[in-house]
């Protein structure tokens, strides 16, 4: 069994960096899509559903779009600036997702709906990049 484990580890060690890259792209693209889905600005759906001002609703849409873009781009910046950008993206994702869960899905706490929703996995992704930065 150890021999098989070593062979599998050796195989995947050559492509280990792809795991975090796939995760980064998945979370980033999800935020880009969610942000773009709120265009044109101001996003009337957010204004009507949450009774937000046009400025705040537009800020949410732009924030989601930019966070996704920055999360992806920062993964290719291999210095402290890229690391900070990744952490800031993770922080913004975490804040956005906690806010969304509290205001839009408070009835999900703590049910199976919470743990089978896209939102919880986006939150987990945000926390991951906040903690790990570019050291993934």
Regions found by a protein language model. Give the residues of each.
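Membrane-interface interhelical connector segments
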Residues: 3, 40-54
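Extended, low-polarity transmembrane helix blocks
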Residues: 1-37, 58-66, 70-136
């Amino acid at each position: 069994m150890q021999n098989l484990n070593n062979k599998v580890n050796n195989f995947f060690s050559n492509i280990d960096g792809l795991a975090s890259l796939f995760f980064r792209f998945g979370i980033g693209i999800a935020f880009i899509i969610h942000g773009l889905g709120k265009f044109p600005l101001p996003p009337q759906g957010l204004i009507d559903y949450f009774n937000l001002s046009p400025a705040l609703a537009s800020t949410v849409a732009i924030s989601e779009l930019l966070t996704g873009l920055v999360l992806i781009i920062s993964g290719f910046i291999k210095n402290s600036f890229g690391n900070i950008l990744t952490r800031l993206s993770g922080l913004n994702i975490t804040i956005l997702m906690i806010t969304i869960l509290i205001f839009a899905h408070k009835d999900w706490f703590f049910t199976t709906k919470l743990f089978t929703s896209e939102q919880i996995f986006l939150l987990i992704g945000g926390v991951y990049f906040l903690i790990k930065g570019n050291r993934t």
